[in-house]
């Protein structure tokens, strides 16, 4: 049992603290004032919600080191889409055709 418990162990408070510290360091490196990432998430959600229905409980938007150059920052989003909002898409398409 001890052998398998290493594979299935849950994150503990040490891992949580480490992840929070990484996030703080990444945000500091990106020179973003506190709260800006949350505001960005809200704005992204508002725009996407015009076109698709999003499962907000499983939404994950975070900043992390860019894979090719860890000195750079990437904004990574995992946004589960439940269904498209065809009414808004149709309305937007009609508006674009008029221009």
From Swiss-Prot:
Keywords: Cell cycle, Cell division. The keyword Nucleotidyltransferase does not apply. InterPro entries: MinE (IPR005527), MinE_sf (IPR036707). Disulfide bonds: none annotated. Coiled coil: none annotated. Transmembrane segments: none annotated. Signal peptide: none annotated. GO terms for cellular component: plasma membrane. GO terms for biological process: division septum site selection; regulation of division septum assembly. It comes from the Bacteria. Prevents the cell division inhibition by proteins MinC and MinD at internal division sites while permitting inhibition at polar sites. This ensures cell division at the proper site by restricting the formation of a division septum at the midpoint of the long axis of the cell. NCBIfam families: minE. Belongs to the MinE family. HAMAP family: MinE (MF_00262). This is Cell division topological specificity factor. The lineage of its organism: Bacteria, Fusobacteriati, Fusobacteriota, Fusobacteriia, Fusobacteriales.
